[in-house]
Every structure is written in C-alpha cells, then in structure tokens.
Design a protein with these regions (language model features):
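Glycine-centered flexibility motif
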Residues: 8-12, 20-23, 31, 90, ...
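General structural signal for secondary-structure boundaries
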Residues: 1-3, 34, 67, 188, ...
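Small-residue-enriched alpha-helical segments and adjacent helix-cap loops
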Residues: 2, 16, 21-162
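Intrinsically disordered, low-complexity polar/charged tails and linkers
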Residues: 1-15
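Residues that form generic nucleotide/phosphate-binding pockets
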Residues: 77, 115, 119, 202, ...
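Mobile "lid/hinge" segments at catalytic clefts and subdomain interfaces of large enzymes
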Residues: 127-129, 133-226
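Flexible, active-site-adjacent loop/turn segments at secondary-structure boundaries
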Residues: 6, 94, 211, 215
Length: 227
C-alpha cells in the first residue's frame, strides 16, 4: 500500500525535481532582512543544504537541496530568527513585496508590509485559497508593478501621519497576463486589511481552483466585481 507524500506547500516547501530533495522559501516583507537573519539563512543553507541561497523576484529567499528529515529543525531555526515561510507557496497570501526601497517614506511602506504579513501569514481563514494571492506596495505608479499584483497598494498621500492608498486589483502575469484595475481610491491605511480580507473572501468563495483573482474579475466584469 503506497502512502502519498506530505504536501508541504503551505509551509513554503516544494519538492525538487531531484529525488529526495526539497526547497524552503522564506518570506521577507518588503524584501528586507536583518544582518542577523541573513546569518541564520546562511547557516541553515550551509548546514542543511549546499551553501547557496536563491533570491526571488518577489524579494523572498530560497534554500535548496534540503532533506525531508531536516525540515522541522530548519523551521525552528528560522523561527528563532523571526523568519517565517508559512504561505510562501501554495494557495495562500504570498510574501508582501515593495519595489520602492530607497524612496522617501519607504519605512512607512515597510511597516505596512510587516503588518500585512503578520496578519495573513499562517492565518487559517486565508489559506487553502484557489491559487496563490500576491500583494505589492508601491510609493507611486512609476514602476507599474502594481499592475501585476492580485492587490497593488499605491501610496496616494502621506502627510500629518495619515497615509492614503489607491488599491489596484486583479493583475497578473503568466500565460494570460492581465493588468490590474483601479478598485478603490485614497483609502486610509487602517482600512487596508479589512478591504483585502473582503477581496479574499470573494475570491475564495467564487473562484474555482486553480484560478487566480484575475480570472474571477474577468468573468464577473470589473464593475460587477467592484460592486
């Protein structure tokens, strides 16, 4: 009698094509990692892998060539450094990106990215989604990265300790690329989590696996989806 292999995807782990080896993805909100955390990742890679780390286009890190028996210990080592992999793979809210490093006001964007990760990473209400769900935060429209996110947050105003964001949704790349569309304008930061939760509930309830949010928006139509 054969036993199905465990599904580690929600813990940020994929089985490699090479037999008996696994990849561990580590979420880094806004692509930021401390020196101490970087040392931990390097130590884990050297001790359990082949001493190399891959950097992803979404600001995460991947450690390859890991053995299944070592995965629990690796998870503990990463957690001690304040690092999480929960939701880095599979049908979950993936790592929160921010392509606006170095611009004025980036610390506030990084802080929001960390808030979003704390809220959604490992939150059972928003796991086992039809497909991955990507969120990005940007200081402006210049890089157009907000157009390829499931939810793109673009800073519209920041003064007097008040940050307002335009919310773009339903973008994505892949075989059928689609630009996101403007969903809501000038939303206060304190409402962002509630709005994303509402979008996720609609997505989870109406999108058939393995469809992304862009397919649901296309099926409903932008106006109907927004309503």
């Amino acid at each position: 009698m054969s036993t199905a292999a465990p599904d580690y995807r929600l813990d940020g782990i994929y089985k490699q094509r090479q037999d008996d080896f696994f990849m561990q993805r580590v979420k880094l909100p806004a692509g930021v990692i401390s020196a101490g955390q970087a040392r931990t990742v390097a130590t884990v890679s050297t001790r359990f892998g082949q001493g190399t780390v891959h950097l992803t286009t979404r600001g995460s890190m991947e450690i390859h060539w890991l053995k299944e028996k070592d995965l629990p210990q690796i998870k503990r080592e990463l957690a001690k450094a304040g690092l999480t992999s929960r939701g880095a793979c599979g049908g979950a809210v993936r790592g929160i990106t921010c392509g606006s490093q170095g611009v004025q006001g980036f610390p506030a964007l990084e802080s929001l990215a960390r808030r979003l990760q704390r809220h959604f990473a490992g939150n059972p209400r928003f796991e086992r989604l039809p497909k991955k769900f990507k969120i990005g935060i940007e200081a402006d429209l210049t890089g157009r990265r907000h157009l390829i996110q499931d939810v793109g947050l673009v800073l519209a105003k920041s003064d007097n300790n008040i940050s307002l964001f335009d919310i773009w949704i339903a973008g994505g790349l892949g075989k059928e690329p689609q630009s996101g569309f403007l969903f809501l304008e000038r939303m206060p930061e304190e409402r962002i989590i509630l709005i994303i939760e509402a979008i996720l509930r609609v997505y989870a309830a109406h999108a058939p696996p393995p469809k992304r949010l862009k397919f649901l928006a296309k099926e409903f139509g932008k106006l109907n989806f927004a309503n």
